[in-house]
Amino acid sequence: MVDIDTGWGGSEEISNTIAEMENAGVAAVHIEDQVYDKRCGHRPNKQIVSVAEMQDRLKAAVDAKKDESFFIMARTDALASEGIEKAIERCGEYLKVGADGIFFEAALSLDEYKEFKKNFSFPLLANITEFGKTPLFTQKELSDVGVDIVLYPLTAFRAMSLSAEKIYNSIIKDGTQEPLLDIMQTREELYEVLDYYNFEKQLDEQFENNNKESS
């Protein structure tokens, strides 16, 4: 699932974005109802567009997709400014124009997710990002109130960022990375994750075939 923010422009840009995502093999996107100059969903003073404008964004996305299985998630940031009831009303309007599911941003409690599922049977996404407004609910807690998809958007990034900071500070201090080797992923482990040897084998076969054809 790719975050396309507010769609990166008007209807034409949204259509182009969806086409590019499908061509790249993306399975799903989420598009939101903040104004174009948006901010982080867990920061104060967010501003949202009208229901009609968000519906136009969704219509452009839905009309542009060629693959029926391509999933378009409508994200709403309305909870902070309009409250749970208005946010749920908005979601109903988004689903009417073809959204496949709802991304309910910056929920404060499990009851808010439960309230949503009382109204709709469509898939519901919970964004469980660290250090934000939403508590770090467990997968079981979320499943029990009807959440279908859980997003951990920055979990690995935050760990990697802190690790990188510590590593480069260590190199500055010691002048070498040698003391850090035991906490690193080895070349062999990386190749295994990437299935690199299989790729290399295919590349060798391709070169061999090309050489045969040219000789």
Where are these regions (language model features)?
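Alpha/beta enzyme core
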Residues: 1-152, 158, 162, 166-169, ...
